[in-house]
UniProtKB/Swiss-Prot annotation:
The lineage of its organism: Bacteria, Bacillati, Cyanobacteriota, Cyanophyceae, Thermostichales. Chlorophyll a 8 binds at residue 99. Keywords: Chlorophyll, Chromophore, Magnesium, Membrane, Metal-binding, Photosynthesis, Photosystem II, Thylakoid, Transmembrane, Transmembrane helix. It comes from Thermostichus vulcanus (Synechococcus vulcanus). GO terms for cellular component: photosystem II; plasma membrane-derived thylakoid membrane. It is found in: Cellular thylakoid membrane. This is Photosystem II CP47 reaction center protein. The gene is psbB.
Length: 505
């Protein structure tokens, strides 16, 4: 028999069962997607889209449905917070059901093709020999893929026949599903511009349709056909793996660095938004604008959306996860309940002090307070006997603006220190750690898991491409033949069915 790593060679000269294997694989993928969607719906809590969004709950397939326009449930809730809605058939449950039904039909098709493997379709009508016209099949597949790509861009995304896609502002506050017009100018190449997604699907679809028709109608030159081994099914495998690993690298990048197709409302913020103080700068800009228009500090900070403040918290940074830390973010720091408000620290001279924030890759970080010039004015010392900047010595107090503790000031050092320790993580929130038995160790968001998985798959598939590409290009070199072997062990197509001695020609 064959060793376990060579079992797929039984499909090399057997188009019928190659189709069956692919149908079964698609059935498994569609079945997984539908089942996973139902599992996530069973565990998803839609009650607080601001402080307990899907990405905090570790949802993996829901955000992908939402970005394509599915936002409602047959239970009447929507991910944007509405209740009592009627989403029609294309709800989360409807999509899950469609995938499970598709999976069942594909399973039956796989069984049929496994039993009826020897079809007239796979034989050359001129010779009666088994033969596949691979260049023509490539053209047909390219044409169909181009048609799908064009249809998705021109109809689904534009809203002409479909819902559009998830569109939001740069700070992930006002997202919703909207029809999107294509952006044909240079701004279409901005990865954060949804119009570019539409334009590129339309353009790529047209190119795919034209290229597909070309490959259906035009035969490859003989020298090129032989040089690229176009008659060998392993060439198809090698080039297909190349396409897939390239796509996996691309989506790992767009997910980790962020793009219009990976909105932060659905997948959580990127690590670079914490690293660059992206949300902190926007919050400060809004506060300064409010103060300039005559608002008090309390009013200015109370106007900051809780959603924006929550993004400015290190626990939502996907780089704060870790290997083997399974589970959703809520299993780490807990389920966020409320924003405590913005903490402002001052020393006994009344000078405002700023807590230095923890960089992404630190697990622990000292509590250091600096003035506006970056000069250290207070800290929580490791060795109290030698301290000069302790909270007690510097008379540090904390006042809260906005949030639950709006307008309150605390002066007792233990309380002030407890808030300073929390302030190194960004804005301060109250968490429920009991419901999920949260352990206090940060987890990554679906953004981190998706990136990690696709980077790993891409690397593995890259080696698969090299392996199968080398095998198809150098097959004659690799398969050096022992002259003592009998013809049936050597000759391709000696048996009509591989390994079946009853089908000898």
């Amino acid at each position: 028999g064959l060793p376990w790593y060579r079992v797929h060679t039984v499909l090399i000269n057997d188009p019928g069962r190659l189709i069956a294997a692919h149908l079964m694989h698609t059935a498994l993928v569609a079945g997984w997607a539908g089942s996973m969607a139902l599992y996530e719906l069973a565990t998803f809590d839609p009650s607080d889209p601001v402080l307990n969004p899907m990405w905090r709950q570790g949802m993996f397939v829901l955000p992908f449905m939402a970005r394509l326009g599915v936002t409602g449930s047959w239970s009447g809730w929507s991910i944007t917070g509405e209740t009592g809605i009627d989403p029609g058939f294309w709800s989360f449950e409807g999509v899950a059901l469609a995938h499970i039904v598709l999976s069942g039909l594909l399973f039956l098709a796989a069984c049929w093709h496994w039993v009826y493997w020897d079809l007239e379709l796979f034989r050359d009508p001129r010779t009666g020999e088994p033969a596949l016209d691979l260049p023509k099949m490539f053209g047909i597949h390219l044409f169909l893929a181009g048609l799908l790509c064009f249809g998705f861009g021109a109809f689904h995304l534009t809203g002409l026949f479909g819902p559009g896609m998830w569109v939001s502002d740069p700070y992930g506050l006002t997202g919703s599903v909207q029809p999107v017009a294509p952006e044909w100018g240079p701004d279409g190449f901005n990865p954060y511009n949804p119009g570019g997604v539409v334009a590129h699907h339309i353009a790529a679809g047209i190119v795919g349709i034209i290229a597909g028709l070309f490959h259906i109608l035009v035969r490859p030159p003989q020298r090129l056909y032989k040089a690229l081994r176009m008659g060998n099914i392993e060439t198809v495998l090698s080039s297909s793996i190349a396409a897939v690993f390239f796509a996996a690298f691309v989506v790992a990048g767009t997910m980790w660095y962020g793009s219009a197709t990976t909105p932060i409302e659905l997948f959580g913020p990127t690590r670079y938004q914490w690293d660059s103080s992206y949300f902190q700068q926007e919050i400060n800009r809004r506060v300064q604008a409010s103060l300039a228009s005559g608002a008090t500090l309390e009013e200015a900070w109370s106007a900051i959306p809780e959603k924006l403040a929550f993004y400015d918290y290190i626990g939502n940074n996907p780089a704060k996860g870790g290997l083997f830390r399974t589970g959703p973010m809520n299993k780490g720091d807990g389920i966020a309940q409320a924003w405590k408000g913005h903490a402002v620290f001052r020393n006994k001279e009344g000078e405002e002090l700023f807590v230095r924030r923890m960089p992404a890759f630190f697990e622990s970080f000292p509590v250091i307070l600096t003035d506006k010039n970056g000069v250290v004015k207070a800290d929580i010392p490791f060795r109290r006997a030698e301290s000069k900047y302790s909270f007690e010595q510097q008379g540090v107090t904390v006042s809260f603006y906005g949030g639950e503790l709006n307008g309150q000031t605390f002066t007792d050092p233990p309380t002030v220190k407890s808030y300073a320790r929390k302030a190194i993580f960004g804005e301060i929130f109250e968490f429920d750690t009991e419901t999920l038995n949260s352990d206090g160790i940060f987890r990554t968001s679906p953004r981190g898991w998706f990136t990690f998985a696709h980077a790993v798959f891409a690397l593995l598939f890259f080696f698969g491409h090299i392996w199968h590409g080398a095998r198809t290009l150098f097959r004659d070199v690799f398969s050096g033949i022992d002259p003592e072997l009998s013809p049936e062990q050597v000759e391709w197509g000696f048996y009509q069915k591989v390994g079946d001695v009853t089908t000898r020609k």
